[in-house]
Structures are given as structure tokens and as C-alpha cells.
């Protein structure tokens, strides 16, 4: 069987399973999630052995330390996967929820019911835990899923898939509800993103190159974000302590996440007071600063000159671009021009400016007096997330269970006909 035939077979099976899964009630889905979690705990040694096999191959292939870190499963990580599935089971089931019921003049009753998307294709790199997270979220939201993990995590993903299938069987659900590709052939990705008759949406999770390729080539809708070029703007009305703590946390809490601040904007009236204090804190943590001419005039030689490339870059590293702006107008203009529409924050004590920032900054998450690091499914109360979307359709921001559903109109009548 060639790759095209294999993927067609998976797609057909997923479509059939999606119809069965859409009918499954909450108790059955939760039973499957708990059974999968139990299987993961029970098969911990097998999972770790499979992961060691992947790690050995990765080292022989010369993968860097960052990739090895993402690939590594620990005993603690295995238990965390199981706990994550139990947390998904504890979340409210969005499927079947009915909103906005109302009577129309004709006498019909109208509303919207939340329903699964159908079949979700998920393409990701390195992290084996994504296999369990993605399977759990799709299962709870009533979607069948086809998972394509990175080839470097092949054995880990297959071992996790075996636990998933064991849990599905225990709950009386079809194994085809969650299918993990049993091939490392890259042609499988091209087939997966070009099967609109079987796949309803694609969610890519990985590097910019992967996501850009899928966005360009997919014949199926894509939920994605390319970059996390996030900003914090410190207004001249900001509380100095709030500004310091937020600007420090947003950059240094973790460097490699998509909600980490990459550019700091400071009002000109606040710059000479705030920048030296912040710079010392950044330098203590090993953060390299790249600034505009005004920033360099205030802070001196340690600051490299920032270029347009710096304003546009998601560093994912201890590097920060810093710019002094004359007012909120320039701050908003800079963010909307150079940002990635992911997450941006203002620090201000002025109510009018905070509301203006919320209205005019064109990002999936816009914050007032809070760190950009809060842009996260768990922090938003969504539970686990499948990813973060910077698109405006279909989902925007952290995508949890609700983001894996859509709504259909329902009409209840009592014999009405249209005149």
C-alpha cells in the first residue's frame, strides 16, 4: 500500500469514527479519558523504553540539546500526561450546549447548538506529550483525530497510541477515533492536508517553517499562529512597580514560549526613570538588549542598535528589543505594524487609554496591567489547549474544547409553515 492509499484509508476510518464519537455521551467520553490515563500509568516503563529508543536515535542523528529536551519523557512527565487527561475529563463537555434560544414572531423557537468539527488533523514536532493532550482534547470535544508527530518521536508516539486505543476499547469507542500515523514518510503530511472530504481542520504545532508550509499548501482550513512577537507598552501613567514586575516577568519567566514579550515599548516621559532600573534587572538575568537611538542614549554602549528586523523578530531567547515612543498612538501603530497579532499588553493607570488599547490593538489577546505570559489555555480557565490561533476565523487565541466545536442553528416548531 502506498502513502496515498494509506492516508485515504485513515481518512475514511476517521470520518466513520467521527459520526460514532459525535453521538457518544459525556460519561462514555470521560470513561475513555480515565481509561487512557490508567493505561499510560500502567505502561509507564514501556513508554519510557520507547522514548529512550527515540533519544538514542536522536543523539546519533546529531539533534541539538533543545530538541532532545523537547523529546525527552521522564517518569514525572508520563504521570503529568495521565493527570492532563483526567483534567480534561473534569472539564465541562461543550457538545450539545444550546445558546441564545428565543421565540420568533412566527412562533418558531430558534437557538444554536454546539457540535464537534468532525475530523481534526494535528501535525506536530518532537514533544510526545502532545499525542496524549491532542487525543484527549479531540475525544472530549467529540472529534475524531489523525495525529502526525515528528519522526524523531516515532516510537514514543506509537507507545502512547497503544494506551489511547486500549482506553477507547475499554469505553466501547472505536480505535479509529484516534489514529497516530504509523509512517515517518513526509509525503503523509502532504496527503493529510489535502483531504477535505475526510479532514475538517488542520492544527499544526511546531516551527515557523512547518506552519508556513502547511498554511500555504493545505486544502483544509488551518488553525494556527506563525509567530509570538508579543509587546508590553509602559505608558507614562503606569505604576512604576507594576511596570517593572510585568516587563521583567513577560520576558524572563520563560524565553522559549510564544507568549513571551519580545519588544518593550516605553513612553518617552517614563524612559529615563524606568529604563535604567529595568536594564539592570535584564542584564542580571543575561538578557541582551537591542534598542532605538533614544534607548542607547539613556543606557549606553551595552545596548546594540535595533533594526527593523529586531522589531519583527520572535527571538525565543534572552534577547529583547526596546523602543521609546512618544505616546500611545505610536505604541499602537508599532504593535499593529510589527507584531504577530498574538498577545500584547499595556501598563497604565489611565482608564481611557486602557480601553483604547483594548479596542485598537489587533491581537488575539490584549491585556491591561498583566504579563503576556498569561496568554495560555490553563490560565484562561479553558483547561488544556490544542494551540493558540492568531487567525480571526474560526477560533482566536488559546484553542480549548470550545474551539474544537462549531455551532449549528436549531429550530423548534409546532407545525408552523411560512406564509
Swiss-Prot record:
Q: Name one Pfam family in it.
A: Aldedh
Keyword entries, A-Z: Amino-acid biosynthesis, Cytoplasm, NADP, Oxidoreductase, Proline biosynthesis
Any GO BP annotation: L-proline biosynthetic process
Q: Which GO terms describe its molecular function?
A: glutamate-5-semialdehyde dehydrogenase activity; NADP binding
The answer, when asked if Ribonucleoprotein is one of the entry's keywords, is: no
Show the GO cellular component annotation of the record. Answer: cytoplasm
- EC number(s) stated in the UniProt entry for this protein: 1.2.1.41
Among InterPro entries, the record links this protein to:
Ald_DH/histidinol_DH, Ald_DH_C, Ald_DH_N, Aldehyde_DH_dom, G-glutamylP_reductase_CS, Glu-5-SA_DH, GPR_dom
Q: Cross-referenced PROSITE patterns, in alphabetical order?
A: PROA
What does the UniProt entry say about where the protein is found? Cytoplasm
Gene3D superfamilies documented for this protein: Aldehyde Dehydrogenase, Chain A, domain 1, Aldehyde Dehydrogenase, Chain A, domain 2
Catalytic activities: L-glutamate 5-semialdehyde + phosphate + NADP(+) = L-glutamyl 5-phosphate + NADPH + H(+)
Which top EC class is named for this enzyme in its record?
oxidoreductase
Chief subcellular location equals: cytoplasm
**This protein's pathway:** Amino-acid biosynthesis; L-proline biosynthesis; L-glutamate 5-semialdehyde from L-glutamate: step 2/2
Q: Has keyword Oxidoreductase?
A: yes
Annotated family: Belongs to the gamma-glutamyl phosphate reductase family.
HAMAP family assigned: ProA
What function does the entry list? Catalyzes the NADPH-dependent reduction of L-glutamate 5-phosphate into L-glutamate 5-semialdehyde and phosphate. The product spontaneously undergoes cyclization to form 1-pyrroline-5-carboxylate.
Tell me which NCBIfam families the record gives.
PRK00197.1, proA
Q: What is this protein called?
A: Gamma-glutamyl phosphate reductase
Q: Organism classification, top ranks?
A: Bacteria, Pseudomonadati, Pseudomonadota, Betaproteobacteria, Neisseriales
Amino acid at each position: 500500500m502506498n502513502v496515498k492509499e494509506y492516508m485515504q484509508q485513515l481518512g475514511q476510518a476517521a470520518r466513520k469514527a467521527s459520526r460514532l464519537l459525535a453521538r457518544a455521551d459525556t460519561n462514555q467520553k470521560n470513561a475513555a479519558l480515565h481509561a487512557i490515563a490508567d493505561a499510560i500509568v500502567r505502561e509507564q516503563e514501556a513508554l519510557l523504553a520507547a522514548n529512550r529508543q527515540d533519544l538514542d536515535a536522536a543523539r546519533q542523528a546529531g539533534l541539538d540539546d533543545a530538541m532532545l529536551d523537547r523529546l525527552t519523557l521522564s517518569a514525572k512527565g508520563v504521570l503529568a500526561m495521565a493527570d492532563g487527561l483526567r483534567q480534561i475529563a473534569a472539564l465541562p463537555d461543550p457538545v450539545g450546549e444550546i445558546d441564545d434560544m428565543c421565540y420568533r414572531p412566527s412562533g418558531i423557537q430558534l437557538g444554536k447548538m454546539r457540535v464537534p468539527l468532525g475530523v481534526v488533523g494535528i501535525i506536530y514536532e518532537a514533544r510526545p506529550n502532545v499525542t496524549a493532550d491532542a487525543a484527549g482534547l479531540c475525544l472530549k470535544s467529540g472529534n475524531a483525530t489523525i495525529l502526525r508527530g515528528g519522526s524523531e518521536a516515532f516510537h514514543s508516539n506509537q507507545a502512547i497510541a497503544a494506551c489511547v486505543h486500549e482506553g477507547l476499547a475499554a469505553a466501547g469507542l472505536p480505535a479509529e477515533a484516534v489514529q497516530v500515523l504509523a509512517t515517518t514518510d513526509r509525503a503523509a503530511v502532504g496527503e493529510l492536508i489535502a483531504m477535505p472530504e475526510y479532514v475538517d481542520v488542520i492544527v499544526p504545532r511546531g516551527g515557523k517553517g512547518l506552519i508556513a508550509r502547511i498554511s500555504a499548501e493545505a486544502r483544509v482550513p488551518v488553525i494556527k499562529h506563525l509567530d509570538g512577537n508579543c509587546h508590553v507598552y509602559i505608558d507614562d501613567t503606569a505604576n512604576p512597580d507594576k511596570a517593572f514586575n510585568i516587563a521583567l516577568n513577560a520576558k524572563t519567566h520563560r524565553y522559549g514560549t510564544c507568549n513571551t514579550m519580545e519588544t518593550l515599548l516605553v513612553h518617552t516621559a517614563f524612559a529615563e526613570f524606568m529604563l535604567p532600573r529595568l536594564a539592570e534587572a535584564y542584564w542580571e538575568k543575561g538578557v541582551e538588549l537591542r534598542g532605538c537611538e533614544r534607548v542607547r542614549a539613556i543606557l549606553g554602549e551595552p545596548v546594540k542598535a535595533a533594526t527593523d528586523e529586531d522589531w519583527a523578530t520572535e527571538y525565543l531567547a534572552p534577547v529583547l528589543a526596546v523602543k521609546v515612543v512618544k505616546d500611545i498612538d505610536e505604541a499602537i501603530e508599532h504593535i499593529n505594524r510589527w507584531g504577530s497579532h498574538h498577545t500584547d499588553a499595556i501598563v497604565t493607570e489611565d482608564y481611557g487609554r486602557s480601553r483604547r488599547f483594548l479596542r485598537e490593538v489587533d491581537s488575539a489577546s490584549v491585556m491591561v496591567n498583566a504579563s503576556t505570559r498569561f496568554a495560555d489555555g490553563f490560565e484562561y480557565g479553558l483547561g488544556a489547549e490544542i494551540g493558540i490561533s492568531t487567525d480571526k476565523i474560526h477560533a482566536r487565541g488559546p484553542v480549548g474544547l470550545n474551539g474544537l466545536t462549531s455551532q449549528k442553528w436549531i429550530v423548534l416548531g409546532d407545525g408552523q409553515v411560512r406564509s
